[in-house]
């Protein structure tokens, strides 16, 4: 508890000196690490005031698309999105890229980025590696789903072994004191992933709760903040979001993926469900324009999907967003200062030497 207060005080002092209101908040995991608690408090402090720019990267490409954002704008995203993948060989989604991805996440955190991680989990009836449509976008029968949620059943045990592999990677980040916005079973109100499209208490939300229990109570992954995620009902076969909510006690952040227009109704609906929790755009294709943030100010971060930053957005829009006054990139003192305060407090708590400040937006290696 003393350690937690140490990091909290460091962040609170920085925010107070910067003129930002310090928002105390409690993670859903009562044993959350000091760094996870401080990150959640920071997200609450910027809610309604600023939005962190974020960029997704496939597991086997390093920081390619984060570097592309810098090439396009001269600014690094403030949030780095990694992925655990599902395929094999040299594919961009290859599971062989996981060890390097974890090391890249550590580097990005040291350099001042917030971290979020996604996992396109394979069906528990399959073995990695798989193809996207053959497993991730395939389905389970109702009988298989029931068995998956039955403790001790053969399929439940296969699922445990499957998720325990990912827990091992997340433990490396826990031991490195890296807080992670973890977004499991994303877009669960849609029917395009095997885990999605099952509303109600024994549906997709039950699987999310089962994973929470495994990661928190068995593996003690206390560095995770839990970012529950749904897809916007933008003409797709996505169900009513409330029917997929696991409960306020399982979500630190309430997030929505939007590919298309940023309809004000989506924002209103997610706010109504989130209450005082921070909200986020878990994935986007087309970037939200600066005007969107004027009418939808409570988005605390967005994450653009990999190559879409270059191939799906006009250069003028990308630069307008990254240079908007309410958008936080890695070099912005409103983001860089608080995250540096968290890392400094961690180092002092552990008795480590102070870290060297990273160079300001170094050009990525070619």
Where are these predicted regions, by residue range?
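N-terminal module-boundary/linker segments of secreted carbohydrate-active enzymes
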Residues: 24-85, 90, 94-95, 344-353
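Alpha-helical scaffolding within the catalytic cores
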Residues: 37-39, 61-71, 99-103, 165-169, ...
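Bacterial N-terminal signal peptides
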Residues: 7-18
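Aromatic- and acid-rich polysaccharide-binding/catalytic face
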Residues: 82, 241-262, 303-305
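Substrate-binding cleft of secreted/luminal carbohydrate-active enzymes
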Residues: 51-56, 277-361
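Aromatic-lined carbohydrate-recognition surfaces of secreted/lumenal glycan-active proteins
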Residues: 54-56, 183-185, 208, 212-239, ...
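Substrate-binding cleft of extracellular glycoside hydrolase catalytic domains
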Residues: 90-221
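Loop/turn elements at helix/coil->beta-strand transitions in domains of secreted/extracellular proteins
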Residues: 48-51, 75-78, 110-115, 175-181, ...
